[in-house]
Amino acid sequence: MRILTLTILVISIFLSCTDMSIPLPKPRVYPKVVYPVKDYQSFSSNNCPFSMMIPKYFIFNQDNNKTENEKQYTCWFDLVCNKLNTNIHMSYVPIDNRADLDEMIQDAFEMVNKHNVKASYRDEIKINIAEKKIYGLVFKIDGPVASPTQFFLTDSTSHFLRGSLYFNDVVNRDSIAPVYDFLELDVSKMIETLEWK
């Protein structure tokens, strides 16, 4: 009897240790994004000597978080899109001479260069809309960077506008790619429709 009980116990232990299920990795999924309808409206502000078309799903927020040296600039603002958890920071600075322009261009490059640590690739696209006196560069930065698109626009004599697209979350380039592509069209539209006053 003892041998029978011991045999049954040993067989039970061996049978209970086998796992017939095969472990499978979980499929990679990303949250579903509900895109707003692409529709644009004219943007113009008394503080800003330019106008452009901006998406209707962006909210204008005046930037009041400036240092003492920056308070003179009244045309700094964010275009916020809560639905896509992103914003475009815009800063306009009037320029009086070539030295001011060179300094602003240098600042724009320094802001872009701060992303080089995490960037895997950077593309610079020249903007030249001579009939509207709009010149500048668009920087497209690939990799887990805070701002994958930055740009600056100028008429090279009195206006300088800088913009940066930010995602308000940890950036996994694969997961934000569809949202990034969606917003790239908006940034392009803003640049194409810019008019100096």
Task: Kindly label every feature range from the protein language model.
Residues 1-5:
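Positively charged n-region of N-terminal signal peptides that target proteins for export
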Residues 13-16:
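C-terminal motif of bacterial Sec signal peptides marking the signal peptidase cleavage site
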Residues 18-21:
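Bacterial signal peptide processing site
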Residues 23-26, 120, 125-197:
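Short, well-structured beta-strand
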Residues 25-46:
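Post-signal peptide N-terminal segment of mature Sec-exported envelope proteins
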Residues 46-106:
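Secretory pathway targeting signatures of secreted, lumenal, and periplasmic proteins
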Residues 57-68, 113-127:
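Short secondary-structure junctions
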Residues 61, 111-114, 190-193, 197:
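Structured segments of extracytoplasmic/periplasmic soluble domains
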